[in-house]
Amino acid sequence: MSYTPGHHAGSRSSSGNRSGILKKTSWVDQSERSHQTYNRGRKPQPKFTVSTQPQGNPIPHYSWFSGITQFQKGRDFKFPDGQGVPIAYGIPPSEAKGYWYKHNRRSFKTADGQQKQLLPRWYFYYLGTGPYASSSYGDAHEGIFWVASHQADTSIPSDVSARDPTIQEAIPTRFSPGTILPQGYYVEGSGRSASNSRPGSRSQSRGPNNRSLSRSNSNFRHSDSIVKPDMADEIASLVLAKLGKDSKPQQVTKQNAKEIRHKILMKPRQKRTPNKFCNVQQCFGKRGPLQNFGNSEMLKLGTNDPQFPILAELAPTPGAFFFGSKLELFKRDSDADSPSKDTFELRYSGSIRFDSTLPGFETIMKVLKENLDAYVNSNQNTVSGSLSPKPQRKRGVKQSPESFDSLNLSADTQHISNDFTPEDHSLLATLDDPYVEDSVA
């Protein structure tokens, strides 16, 4: 008996195409079919925002899961050993084996007429299913990455049935806690639905309002806002063009960086967001017992540090801050610059609790250990490096060995001079007096 991922979804056999983007059906094809039904013989209007480029390699099989999309160029798609198999209700760990298939997507035309190639998207198929159903686990294929759990036997195909897209919806991709996702990729969600983009549904075709339906379809044909998959980049470019902004990253000059830093520092301390233009020390001061988080790299980049987003998942919400913390109000002494201004401090203390089931737990623990009290090790390295300063030498002047000895001697004397008693100082003063021979009477 074959296993069926999320077999409870099979009861929704009448859902049709409700899964939208999670099922790799073409919404453009759906809209074209609806035009053929309601256009009364008229020629379909061209879709001005659709590229004439090829649509990319087709997906001959339907994956059980939503895809993983690349959003940063030059990033490799990979998972650590034993990770990378999506979890699904009804599938035991012994069947958690398969491969990720790279789907090269189409290009589209931006608002300024340029062609932009979408980055690829990856789909998961169980071992023995999908476009490489006949391949054995580990076979070398371009655009294929094999994954399996430690409990799975990869020598035999998985006993998982194929997905019928007409009665079975795709499952949002989720991974077991601690899974490290490929950098530069994000998991596709199920927020967008195709139901809103189907003007020819049965609920609309029924009833006496066929004339209004015809008029709405006529307006629909002339609209270039047809919902199509993979339109996030296209929509963003249209919005930026409407706002008069260039979607290409602008080069930040020193003057711009200075303005950004000034704008951040003008905000109240609790509203500042440190970044690579205004670092942590500039926003909140040096590290110490009361501000003990951040290593040298994170202090320099602030929230632009690649490790910061996973830490932000631990940050409390405003509600948790006020209602889950101990708050105390104190009045501070007025500053000398503004003696007439009353200054108050709202001091807080609380805790953030999490366990090993939190997604990315191992990565979070690693980042926390690297940044908690990192200033202590930094200070120790600074002190150890300053105990034996390297003597400075002038350019073009060759120093003799005697000069190096005198420099080292003066450095040693400087470190031990604080231990001298007043008697020792008087004795040294006597020794420093020039030698004068005794006169002969």
From Swiss-Prot:
RNA-binding, as annotated region: 53-193
Ranges of biased composition (kind: Low complexity): 11-20, 189-220
Polar residues composition bias: residue spans: 380-389
Residue stretches in coiled coil: none
Sequence positions bearing Phosphothreonine: T173, T421
Region of interest: Disordered: 1-56, 186-226, 380-408
Alphabetized Pfam families for the sequence: CoV_nucleocap (PF00937)
Subcellular location: Virion; Host endoplasmic reticulum-Golgi intermediate compartment; Host Golgi apparatus
Main location: virion
Dimerization: annotated span: 264-382
Family the UniProt entry places it in: Belongs to the betacoronavirus nucleocapsid protein family.
Name this polypeptide is given: Nucleoprotein
UniProt organism field: Human coronavirus HKU1 (isolate N5) (HCoV-HKU1)
Taxon lineage: Viruses, Riboviria, Orthornavirae, Pisuviricota, Pisoniviricetes
